[in-house]
């Protein structure tokens, strides 16, 4: 991702990001001396206002960065939403930087659509993905990008100086991963659907308000009813870890807006771990 930002932008350029956002994005933009321009996603569906988005493009944005499915909201962008974004990219001559690491974790009623498959978008889209989630090898830190040759040439230049390269044994193993049959992805998706149902059903029974994720493996829960007056989400999360034994991430890590009542919890765990977490939360 950071190599792509360096490859596509110049110092002072603006990059549009939806909020809530994966916290690394802001830091990566700042590293490239770029200015983030945030467009809010409105819960519970995390939709966006098309006029607000176009106003962001009108500021002369060089690119828009989208996590689809989204970390942390679990939003899966619809075809109509992506089509609108693509039309704005073309109209204002901007790139689309797509973080698609959760592309195979999408739940019933939703479908992951690749931005570079839309008319006029192949030449202005960089699709970034990772082996971490799809093949459960998060510790390997292996990722890849797909883009037109002229853009890839620049990305590779930055990647060479930033990273040099991944360990060759891991790259050989990655080839095996990428050659998995379709049945693997079907079983993989079904497994995550099972974990999601187990965890969200438990939250419903306990009565903790949350937004139902459309993809990825996160839940944004509303801690407002449980907070003391003047308590921050950071303090709440620290107390949760120390006294309840359940770790969550404060929402202020992800929102550009003044949000203090949301935490992110992830459910990519064994069944017994999820049951234990739900028991501690009840």
Predicted segments, located by residue:
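PLP-dependent class I/II
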Residues: 1-282
């Amino acid at each position: 991702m950071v190599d792509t930002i360096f490859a596509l932008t110049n110092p002072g350029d603006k990059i549009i990001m939806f909020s809530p956002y994966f916290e690394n994005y802001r830091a990566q933009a700042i590293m490239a001396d770029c200015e983030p321009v945030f467009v809010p996603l409105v819960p519970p569906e995390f939709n966006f206002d098309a006029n607000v988005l176009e106003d962001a493009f009108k500021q002369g944005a060089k690119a828009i960065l989208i996590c689809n499915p989204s970390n942390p909201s679990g939003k899966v962008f619809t075809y109509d939403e992506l089509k609108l974004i693509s039309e704005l990219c073309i109209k204002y001559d901007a790139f689309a930087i797509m973080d698609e690491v959760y592309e195979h974790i999408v739940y019933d009623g939703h479908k992951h659509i690749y931005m570079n498959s839309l008319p006029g978008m192949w030449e202005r889209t960089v699709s970034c993905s990772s082996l971490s989630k799809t093949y459960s090898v998060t510790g390997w830190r292996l990722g890849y990008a797909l883009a037109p040759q002229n853009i890839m040439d620049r990305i590779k230049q930055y990647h060479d100086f930033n990273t040099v390269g991944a360990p060759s044994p891991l790259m050989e193993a990655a080839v095996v991963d990428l050659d998995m049959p379709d049945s693997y992805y079907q079983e993989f998706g079904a497994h995550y659907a099972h974990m999601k149902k187990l965890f969200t059903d438990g939250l419903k029974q306990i009565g903790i308000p949350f937004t139902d994720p459309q993809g990825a493996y996160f839940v944004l829960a509303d801690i407002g009813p449980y907070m003391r007056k003047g308590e921050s989400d950071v303090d709440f999360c620290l107390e949760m870890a120390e006294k309840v034994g359940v770790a969550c991430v404060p929402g202020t890590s992800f929102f550009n807006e003044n949000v203090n009542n949301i935490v992110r919890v992830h459910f990519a765990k064994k069944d017994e771990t999820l049951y234990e977490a739900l028991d501690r939360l009840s």
